[in-house]
A protein has these predicted regions:
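Active/binding-pocket-proximal capping segment
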Residues: 351-359
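N-terminal Sec-pathway targeting helices
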Residues: 3-21
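Residues in the short coil linking paired helices within alpha-helical repeat scaffolds
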Residues: 96, 182, 243-246, 345
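A beta-strand-loop signature enriched in Asp, Gly, Thr, and Trp
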Residues: 302-335, 339
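Low-complexity, Ser/Thr/Pro/Gly-enriched N-terminal "stalk/linker" regions
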Residues: 30-156, 176, 180-183, 187-216, ...
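Well-ordered alpha-helical segments within folded domains of soluble proteins
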Residues: 77-93, 100-101, 158-174, 221-238, ...
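Alpha-helical scaffold segments of alpha-solenoid architecture
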Residues: 266-285, 289, 293-300, 310
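Loop-centered beta-sheet repeat module
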Residues: 218-266
Length: 419
C-alpha cells in the first residue's frame, strides 16, 4: 500500500500550513481493583460488537468513530471512510443489512453535502456521529497553543482506494431487485475515480488527492492495494449496471496488479513511485492477501504468495503488517484468516481467529495491534521523517475485519466465496 494512510495517520499530523506533531499518552485499562478477583463477562461475537455500535447510536444515517476510545487530538471523533465501509460490508455479512444501510446512507449524504466539492468525491474521513442538516462535517480538533481549530491534511484528502471501498460498501448494501440509490452512488464515485486512470508504465490508477481545498496535491504514485480495490469495485459495478465502461476500468486496474507480481520473491510490490513506473519493493501484508481474495483466479495463479507471507511476515501465531514482525496486526491477521477460510484451510483459519480474539479490548472491541506501536515500513506523507505506525488502540477496522473472518464473508464479492 504505497503512501496510503488508509485509516490511522498516526499521531503525527501535517497541517495545510505547517507540520504539527501531536503527542497523546496512551493509557490502557489493566484490570479490576487490586486483590479482588472478578469474572469477565463473555465477549459478544465480532458481529455482535459492530452491530452494538450501531444500536447504541441515535437514529439516522451514521458514521462510526474509527478509534472510539481516543478522547482528544486528530483521531478523536474521526470516522475514516475505509473503516466505515468495511464495517458496512461486515454488517451485511452478519445479516444486519438494515444497520449497514445507515452507514451507506451517511456515505450518500457525504457525497451530496461536502462543504466544497460537488464532483462525486468523498473525504478520507468525516466527523463521527449521526449526519445532520448542512454540510457534511469533517473531523478536527482545537489547539490551545495556536488558539485555532485544526484539520488533518490526510483526513481532508481523497484516496482512490478508500473511495473504492465506499463503492464496495454501497454495492454490498444495494438490493438489486428493489432500488438503485446505492449503486447510483457507487457509479458517481466511480466517475470521479475514472479521471485518475494512468497511461504511464503498466497503467492502472494513481492515488487520488492529499490536502485541503481548493488545490489539494495530486498523488501520482500507484498502489497495488488501491488497484485491487478498484478492479473489484469497477467489476461489480459493471455487473450491477450493465455498463461496459466499468468493465474496461476493472481490466485496467487488474492488469496493473498483475504486473506488480514478482516471481522471484513470490510477492506483489506495494506499487510504484511517483513516476508511475519504478516499483516500490516494500512487502505489505494486504497487498499480498487482497489480490488473492478479490481477483478472479488470483488465489490459484498467485498461490505462492501465501507461503511467502507465512515465511516472511508471521509473528506470534498471527501476522504483522510488514517484514519487521514487531507484533501482530489484528486487521491483517483477520484478512489472512478469511482468505484461508475461503480456500478451505479451516484449521489454519481457526487458529488465526484465536489470535484475533486475544486482541480484544475491555469494551469487547479489538486492538489494532498487539504492541504499543507497530511499524508499517512506510513513512508519513505529512512528515517523511516519521514512520507510519499502528497503535494499540481499539479500532473499528480491526473489529470489522474480525467480523468478516468470523463469518467467512468476502467483502470483495459480498458472498462467502472467492470470485
Amino acid at each position: 500500500m504505497l503512501t496510503v494512510f488508509r485509516h490511522c495517520a498516526g499521531w503525527f499530523v501535517a497541517l495545510s500550513w505547517l507540520l504539527f506533531v501531536v503527542t497523546v499518552p496512551i493509557c490502557l485499562a489493566i484490570g479490576a481493583t487490586a486483590g479482588v478477583k472478578t469474572l469477565a463477562a463473555p465477549k459478544a461475537s465480532a458481529c455482535g460488537y459492530v452491530t452494538d455500535l450501531i444500536d447504541k447510536a441515535s437514529p439516522g444515517p451514521l458514521f462510526l468513530p474509527s478509534y472510539p476510545t481516543v478522547e482528544s487530538g486528530p483521531l478523536h471523533g474521526a470516522a475514516y471512510l475505509y473503516d466505515n465501509a468495511v464495517a458496512a460490508i461486515a454488517l451485511v455479512g452478519c445479516g444486519e443489512r438494515d444497520k449497514a444501510d445507515r452507514i451507506g446512507a451517511a456515505i450518500l449524504w457525504a457525497i451530496d453535502n461536502d462543504r466544497t466539492w460537488h464532483d462525486g468525491r468523498l473525504r478520507n474521513a468525516h466527523a463521527a456521529g449521526v449526519v445532520a442538516n448542512g454540510s457534511a462535517k469533517l473531523p478536527g480538533w482545537w489547539d490551545n497553543t495556536q488558539n485555532k481549530w485544526l484539520e488533518d491534511r490526510y483526513q481532508v484528502g481523497s484516496d482512490n482506494g478508500n473511495i473504492a471501498w465506499a463503492m464496495l460498501a454501497l454495492l454490498s448494501i444495494d438490493d438489486v431487485s428493489a432500488r438503485s440509490r446505492f449503486r447510483d452512488g457507487a457509479a458517481r464515485l466511480g466517475t470521479w475515480v475514472a479521471q485518475w486512470a494512468d497511461t504511464r508504465g503498466t497503467g492502472g490508477f494513481t492515488g487520488g488527492t492529499f490536502g485541503h481545498e481548493p488545490t489539494p496535491d495530486v498523488r501520482t504514485w500507484k498502489s497495488t492495494e488501491h488497484n485491487t480495490d478498484l478492479a473489484c469495485a469497477f467489476g461489480l459495478l459493471a455487473i450491477r449496471t450493465g455498463d461496459s465502461r466499468w468493465r474496461d476500468m476493472a481490466t485496467a486496474a487488474e492488469h496493473f496488479v498483475d504486473t506488480m507480481w514478482d516471481p522471484a520473491c513470490a510477492c506483489f510490490a506495494a506499487g510504484t513511485a511517483e513516476d508511475g513506473v519504478t516499483r516500490n519493493p516494500i512487502l505489505a501484508l494486504d497487498a499480498q492477501v487482497w489480490p488473492l481474495t478479490a481477483l478472479p483466479g488470483a488465489a490459484k495463479k498467485f498461490a505462492s504468495a501465501i507461503t511467502a507471507v507465512e515465511q516472511r511476515m508471521s509473528v506470534d501465531e498471527g501476522f504483522s503488517y510488514g517484514e519487521d514482525r514487531d507484533g501482530v496486526w489484528t486487521e491483517g491477521t483477520s484478512q489472512m484468516a478469511l482468505l484461508l477460510e475461503l480456500l478451505g484451510s479451516t484449521a489454519k483459519a481457526k487458529s488465526l481467529i484465536a489470535v484475533i480474539e486475544s486482541q480484544r479490548s475491555p469494551d469487547g472491541g479489538f486492538y489494532a495491534t498487539s504492541v504499543r506501536e507497530l511499524p508499517t515500513g512506510f513513512m508519513l506523507d505529512t512528515d517523511p521523517t516519521k514512520p507510519r505506525l499502528y497503535f494499540r488502540l481499539p479500532h473499528l477496522g480491526a473489529a470489522s475485519w474480525a467480523a468478516l473472518a468470523e463469518r467467512g464473508f468476502n467483502p470483495f464479492t459480498a458472498t462467502k466465496g472467492l470470485p
